[in-house]
Amino acid sequence: MKTVTEFQNKNILVLGIAKSGYAAATLLQKLGANVIVNDGKPLAENVLAAELQAKGMDVVCGGHPLELLERNISLVVKNPGIPYSNPILVAAKEKQIPIVTEVELAYRISEAPFVGITGSNGKTTTTMLTFEMLKEGQKHPVIAGNIGTVACEVAQDAKENEVVVTELSSFQLMGVELFQPKIAAFLNLFEAHLDYHGTKKEYGLAKANIFKNQTENDYSVINADDADVMALSAYSKGQKVLFSTTKEIEDGACIKDNALYFKAEKVVEVDDIVLPGQHNLENILAAMSIAKLLGVSKEAITAVLKRFTGVKHRLEYVTTINNRKFYNDSKATNMLATEKALSAFTQPTVLLAGGLDRGNEFDDLIPYFKNVKAIVTFGQTAPKLVRAAEKAGLDTIESVDTLDEAVVKAYAHSTDGDVILLSPACASWDQFKTFEERGDIFIQAVHKLI
């Protein structure tokens, strides 16, 4: 960890506890700050808050009182999920108090360089692929951010010869000031999180913060097939490395003659890649680009791609029952993810979909229903998905109350050789705490069929 003195004796407000807030507060105390921790949940229900209080921190729970800002606050470290429209953040901004997220702290103390990966879809798969490729290439990666350990915990122990690989959301990237990844990858962009950002434009600009502090000594890995990403890459001063699944890229990564190439070097045959789905070729090209920029050999990259089968809850193969294959794609929290999942299969498919209603319709899914023989919907968006399925002319459409019921109905509507796919196209928070919980319940329900 770097020697950092900028926080000594400063009053710093950590807003929202959870894992990242707990780690940030603990780190700041270690760096000599006077830490004030604030969380909306009452103290009696907040184990982490009680632990921080036991460490001698000033802990205020049960709301976000504006009076906290009268304590000569030098910095606010916010939980990514707390919107900037929250009154305490509005007031902090008016007082010109800097507001950052935990990943900014991690960067400031880290001896190791960062690789940052963002995009609407594919972040976790690309992050894991990058980590595995760097590990195979003996580049000493450590993984942090939305997957793995909280970034500022990882950064405390990261050495100069290591690489911190981070998956970054728009929420996290809105709160960066100095964060400067050696390599920044922007995978794709489409309309999402409008309840937080308001417009697609603002969402894209938040993502583009990944380029904010890059210089000509850094690299920006860009999806050349995504017009929005290409436009936002104008914010990067780094060396741009493009990747594409649709056209040849002479100075980047592409697919040619059924093989993946990087800067004219043939790296791996497509047929040697075990990870399913056309969309995953984009993720692979991005990860391969990062690995090659950091000096990983094509042999190491190929070795990973011959064994990497995917990430849990992301088009995850579950089991086969009576020649029906079950796939868990619970991470598909938006339409684009479900479109890509449906495009991955040519077999007749029974789709399970539904979840939190964020106000959108689902007509964009209709062109991807060509192999869908039946749909079972659940959750708040069930009626909207039914309308889209009716417009698509599906013969078998059913709505149920629970995911357990949906699995039973989906199996009943399937026949020999079918795929049964959970790809909800919605967030999980109407019925589940997380998409992981939703995926785990799906897997449990599938195993009950055996």
Curated annotation (Swiss-Prot):
Keyword hit for ATP-binding: yes
Residues holding ATP: 119-125
A Gene Ontology cellular-component term: cytoplasm
UniProt keyword annotations, A-Z: ATP-binding, Cell cycle, Cell division, Cell shape, Cell wall biogenesis/degradation, Cytoplasm, Ligase, Nucleotide-binding, Peptidoglycan synthesis
InterPro entries, alphabetized: Mur-like_cat_sf, Mur_ligase_C, Mur_ligase_C_dom_sf, Mur_ligase_cen, MurD
Subcellular location: Cytoplasm
EC number(s) reported in the record: 6.3.2.9
GO MF term list: ATP binding; UDP-N-acetylmuramoylalanine-D-glutamate ligase activity
Reaction catalysis annotation: UDP-N-acetyl-alpha-D-muramoyl-L-alanine + D-glutamate + ATP = UDP-N-acetyl-alpha-D-muramoyl-L-alanyl-D-glutamate + ADP + phosphate + H(+)
Annotated pathway: Cell wall biogenesis; peptidoglycan biosynthesis
Function: Cell wall formation. Catalyzes the addition of glutamate to the nucleotide precursor UDP-N-acetylmuramoyl-L-alanine (UMA).
UniProt-listed HAMAP family: MurD
The family this protein is said to belong to: Belongs to the MurCDEF family.
The protein, known as: UDP-N-acetylmuramoylalanine--D-glutamate ligase
Source species: Bacillus anthracis (strain CDC 684 / NRRL 3495)
Lineage, opening ranks: Bacteria, Bacillati, Bacillota, Bacilli, Bacillales
